[in-house]
Amino acid sequence: MKKFLIFIFCIFAFSTNADEKKTTFTKELFNKAQSDGKVVVVSSWLKYCSSCASQMKVLNKAKNEFDNIEYFTFDIKNKEIAELLNVQYQTTLLIFKDNKEVYRSIGETSRDAIYKAIESSI
């Protein structure tokens, strides 16, 4: 019983972290950010996904460290957005600059790798 309660706690802890500081993706916000000349970072997630929570923690920190970047997330179950961005898996990370996709990864949670991708897009 104790292990079960710990398991349930972990699920809620990860789902809470995955929802922190995110701006939900919409085509309108995405297009506006691009027309404003911002670098746009988009990540896909799935509730109760531990790697999604890990990636989101890195992105939340990056959000405070990099200026002129817009961050969006979307639930991978949203098929309309997934098809628009050609995303098939949660933890897909996309970076757009000058209206072009300049970076794509699946499952990347390393702070160094994510920061390097963002820095090279600025």
Where are these regions (language model features)?
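The canonical Cys-X-X-Cys-His
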Residues: 44, 49-52, 93
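Sec-dependent N-terminal signal peptides
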Residues: 4-12
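Thiol-based oxidoreductase modules, predominantly thioredoxin-like and allied folds used
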Residues: 44, 67-80
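Structural micro-motif
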Residues: 85-94
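N-terminal leader/targeting and pre-domain segments
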Residues: 10, 17-37, 120
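Non-catalytic, surface beta->alpha helical segment in thiol-disulfide oxidoreductase systems
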Residues: 97-122
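Short active-site neighborhood of thiol/selenol oxidoreductases, capturing the structured segment around
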Residues: 35-47
